[in-house]
């Protein structure tokens, strides 16, 4: 446990990519439920990212190896008709597999993953560093994005909506469209 926590701490100031979160942030109550058999959700346990990532590999029966699911999600994400992809947002990025896959699919784009769980973001950042992929991770709720209108070319939500109450899900959709530029794409998988 201490070794893993030390690795997360050491990665915080390293790159490529960046990590921003607030140690005093209180995640929304909906994130604290025992989802996927994780007691207290993925916000309360500092090693939640490790638990999620390795648990997913077991649950998916090997399909999560080499980020197979995330790579296919990145390939399936809609690209604007004009082909211009400069900024991509991954909503509810969890362990960051889809975030890094999006960067590999669109190497010239700035890719940002957001999540309410600092533990997940810290792991996602460590994972991206280990893979040498420059992506950015920010702590914020998908229903209240801290970006200007029209900022992104693409927004993706991979396996996010089953984690949210319906009222929050509607706000997430509104926010996704708000931060998309005209002609941008919003993909829900």
What are these regions (language model features)?
Residues 170-182:
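A short glycine-rich, Lys/Arg-flanked "PGG" loop and its adjoining helix->strand segment in the class I
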Residues 154-167:
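A short SAM/SAH-binding and catalytic strip from SAM-dependent methyltransferases
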Residues 38-42, 48-67:
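Class I SAM-dependent methyltransferase Rossmann-like catalytic core
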Residues 1-43:
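N-terminal auxiliary segments of SAM/dcSAM-dependent transferases
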Residues 183-189:
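Conserved beta-strand signature within the Rossmann-like core of class I S-adenosyl-L-methionine
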Residues 51, 64-84:
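Conserved alpha-helix/loop element of class I SAM-dependent methyltransferases that forms part
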């Amino acid at each position: 446990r201490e070794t893993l926590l030390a690795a997360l701490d050491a990665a915080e100031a390293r790159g490529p990519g960046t990590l921003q979160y607030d140690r005093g942030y209180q995640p929304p109550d909906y994130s604290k439920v025992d989802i996927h058999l994780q007691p207290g959700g993925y916000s309360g346990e500092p090693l939640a990212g490790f638990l999620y990532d390795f648990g997913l590999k077991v649950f998916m029966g090997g399909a999560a190896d080499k980020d197979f699911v995330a790579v296919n999600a990145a390939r399936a994400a809609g690209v604007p008709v004009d082909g211009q992809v400069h900024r991509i947002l991954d909503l509810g990025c969890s362990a960051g597999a889809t975030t890094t896959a999006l960067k590999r699919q669109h190497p010239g784009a700035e890719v940002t993953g957001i999540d309410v769980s600092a533990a997940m973001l810290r792991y996602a950042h460590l994972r991206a560093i280990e893979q040498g992929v420059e992506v950015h991770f920010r702590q914020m709720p998908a229903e209240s994005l801290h970006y200007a209108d029209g900022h992104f070319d693409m927004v993706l939500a991979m396996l996010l909506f089953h984690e949210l109450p319906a009222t929050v899900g509607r706000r997430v959709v509104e926010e996704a469209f708000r931060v998309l530029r005209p002609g941008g794409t919003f993909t829900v998988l």
